[in-house]
Amino acid sequence: MSYMPTSCLVLFFLLFLFHPLPWALSKEDLGWCEALFQCGNNTAGFPFWGGNRAKPCGHPLLELRCLNNITSLNISNHEYNVFHIDQTSNTLRLARTDLLGSFCSAEFNTPTFPREIFKLFPTYKSLTVLYNCDPKLSYRSSYTCPDLGLFSMSQSLDYQNSCQDSFKVNVPTSFVPEEKEMNLTHLESALRKGFEVKLVIDEIPCQECSSSRGICGFNSTTQICCNVTSLSGGVTCVPQHQPSADELRRRCSERFSCGNQRNLYYPFWIPGREYCGHPDFKLDCSGGFAELNIASVNFRILNMSYDSSNKRLARSDYLNDLCPPNPLNDEPLIETVLQFSADTELLTLYYDCQLNSSATSPFPSSYFGELGCDEGRSYYVTRNLSSPLLDRFRGVLNNLREMCKRKVSVPASGPALNTLQTNPNSNNLKMALEHGFELQDNSNCSMCVLSGGSCGYNQNSSLFVCYCKDGPQDNQCDINLDDIIGNRIVAIIIGIFVALCTIGGFIAFLVLLCPCCKVRIFRNRKTSDDRRQEKLKALIPLKHYTYAQVKRMTKSFAEVVGRGGFGIVYRGTLCDGRMVAVKVLKESKGNNSEDFINEVSSMSQTSHVNIVSLLGFCSEGSRRAIIYEFLENGSLDKFISEKTSVILDLTALYGIALGVARGLEYLHYGCKTRIVHFDIKPQNVLLDDNLSPKVSDFGLAKLCEKKESVMSLMDTRGTIGYIAPEMISRVYGSVSHKSDVYSYGMLVFEMIGARKKERFGQNSANGSSMYFPEWIYKDLEKADNGDLEHIEIGISSEEEEIAKKMTLVGLWCIQSSPSDRPPMNKVVEMMEGSLDALEVPPRPVLQQIHVGPLLESSWITEESSSISEIENRNLQVCEKILS
């Protein structure tokens, strides 16, 4: 018996695998696959087929049936009406045909959705319908059908065993079954509107086919690409294969332009780059702008600078019109891909309201205002409706919700809305909408790019993907972070090794010695880097500067603008002309390295109008620098010193104190990881041109999980005069974020002049600052029933009320026990609320704390100018109020 040689078998197999497949239909039929086709009221294309479109044009499970302007689809032997097909996002809105009528007449069963084809959209959920239930029992959200008996609907299966059967239905996530008796009309209405699913068929093979002028199709479940041969005119098809991993990485690393925007990449995309962006972020470049449509709402890119924090979008329909016709209120899913910045708020607009003028005028707060649209009364609310700041106005909000026909929520800039609150008018409202809102970086993409990959999207899993040379990864390419951090050190070691090896007389000695030295050097470096590795991951989105660049931007450190306990601050200028502050840390022993990591890792996680913005950092050996935004007005202590020529009134000081409180509230509650500052004082509060405060200097900060109410510290940190008592003696309680609250209270007292009283009345040499609250409480006791008296002392009643409020808030904040102090979100509420709502806090048991000699490891400083000299007018205000 003879056998075919192995080489022939291999050749035969390859020819069989790659030989073009004959197309089953004619060239004319192939034309139907190329064009979109109309089915009912829908226009569809690949991967659908049906009607005049042949079966090989689409996936075998996606046949559309067209009858009397109705489009339907059969899934697992169940018919679904197709209300809408979005070819751009590959989404369908479906409804079970049997659920379009009476619910009790529907087929009570659950069709199986092929997971390789369909995925339920995240704005919908599945609810379980339990039927043939025990009529003797009581069920939540129940109803009795005439022929099927009692049924109940629930998201849980608490009482499934008492019902004989069950099936599932898809409803919007906002749908909540009634607690007791089911409102059948409510349920039927939700089911008739249908639900959305996303096709998870891989689009990349078809995109590759289209780019080569081929036509996409299917041979069973295998995607194929078909072309008309030039010689015979016949149709040939070949299986489509996805581009290589390195090819995808190369393509997605290339940036693109759209309209007036340049250098765009993930999550945005344009035709031909579908695998390089999120499906919801397809850009339309036709109008001279870069616009995207998410959930039927158009957004325009105003600025998309990946190298800075300036990434702004705005709703297109509100750019030139406060009252656009029929604005949509579908909440966009932007935050699933790009998070809003911390200072973004949801501006809520109410249209066509049938309210009596007495119901809303005058408004109870600056959070509310009138739009002034021509058709009906219209109003706006400048805060997210779920904000605790609006808890006192729920009655007004309920009136607006019930009496207004339309409500629209629009993301907007928090600072712009603050301006609107201060000066409410249509121009400021228009500016707030036209300014747009800021977005944060996509953290997954930042990690991917740093690791050498390119950002993309997996259509099958509907998840982010990082394209790497060796294949796609979930988040980042497989690299050793030690190699990135220490490559300069490695290069130096290798250079020294090579240089020494050239000395012939020491070759034998070096062969024996260098391996040991190399192991020792690498082990020391690795140990040091391992301690920094976790926190360095937080630095990925930041700009890394070399020491030469730092020296160049500061003109060789020419202008000093500030000095601190850990370094000197210089004025600098970036290449784009922006002024920056460059803090160069001292090359000192002790906690210098940890101070640098604390400051950079803490600031890199923040984005808030009252937190100084970190722009980059430098770390070369022992040389470390931090680059952040420059604020011309400098620090707060310059404005509350008696040496200053600029006198701030109480209204300005109140605005600064409120801004600092909001910044601390953000650090404690607004970040993914809670940040405790531990060094709140006037020197660390910077002021911009509008005297808006920004908390700075995070050298002593500590990160902890929000669920942690107690922190473990091995050292004392802070500045004398602002340190919470529990930081020095644990007899007062445990260290927590409430330590910042105490420091804030001391800051408030210094701002309004209360600290000056201590300066005059205290002559002891021990320097303790624990005595100063006692005279405040003594003066409070002199007042009738603990109330503060209204005394005319040459200031306005508004300023007097501000001083009273700040004094009471300060007293609450400096309670000796941390548990008696309010959290910062409560402090903000107290500062924004009315004076009448504030009570005089109970007098704590105050003890003098003697600050003994400090250990070398303690991070505690005593600024010679930290206890500011405050002008006499503010001192007089506080003394009179408390007398």
UniProtKB/Swiss-Prot annotation:
Catalysed reactions listed for this entry: L-seryl-[protein] + ATP = O-phospho-L-seryl-[protein] + ADP + H(+); L-threonyl-[protein] + ATP = O-phospho-L-threonyl-[protein] + ADP + H(+)
Extracellular side: 27-491
Transmembrane segment boundaries: 492-512
Keyword tRNA-binding in record: no
Positions with a binding annotation for ATP: V561, G562, R563, G564, G565, F566, G567, I568, V569, K583
Gene Ontology cellular component annotations, sorted alphabetically: membrane
Pfam family name, one: PK_Tyr_Ser-Thr
Subcellular localization(s) per the UniProt record: Membrane
Residue ranges that the UniProt entry lists as topological domain Cytoplasmic: 513-883
Molecular-function GO terms, alphabetical: ATP binding; polysaccharide binding; protein serine kinase activity; protein serine/threonine kinase activity
InterPro entries from the UniProt entry: Kinase-like_dom_sf, Prot_kinase_dom, Protein_kinase_ATP_BS, Ser-Thr/Tyr_kinase_cat_dom, Ser/Thr_kinase_AS, WAK_assoc_C, WAK_GUB
Protein keywords: ATP-binding, Glycoprotein, Kinase, Membrane, Nucleotide-binding, Phosphoprotein, Receptor, Serine/threonine-protein kinase, Signal, Transferase, Transmembrane, Transmembrane helix
Annotated positions of the Phosphothreonine modification: T546, T716, T719
Glycan attachment sites: N41, N69, N74, N183, N219, N227, N303, N356, N384, N444, N460
Membrane topology label: Single-pass type I membrane protein
Protein EC: 2.7.11.1
Record family assignment: Belongs to the protein kinase superfamily. Ser/Thr protein kinase family.
Protein name: LEAF RUST 10 DISEASE-RESISTANCE LOCUS RECEPTOR-LIKE PROTEIN KINASE-like 2.7
Gene from which this protein is expressed: LRK10L-2.7
